[in-house]
């Protein structure tokens, strides 16, 4: 009986967390040679109509610890849902964004990019108020066993 009650509460807890899970975090790690110029370019991009209508909260962070690769900074795009992710990705072909990439190509070398589903949210759910991210990098050798 104790196992049943324990299982019930664990299932309830996991289900409640799943209801709070929503959206995606896209991260783009870059090696920036001139941080000030890159920040200015990002500010200029985000002040355009393209930037004002972009369907994600955009944040630029400097890595404090990174023994994984040569990236110095990460651009984080916090999407609320699948629709926002699709619109954001589609907007990367816009001439305004393509111009930003051309202007910053001498400043920033792309190192890595990833798309992550938000598993658990907590506290204040407004993306503007959630500017701290923890990313775990794992190498899974047997995905089928890991998924179990």
Predicted segment positions?
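Short S/T/G/P-rich N-terminal loop/turn motif that feeds into the first structured element of a domain
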Residues: 19-148
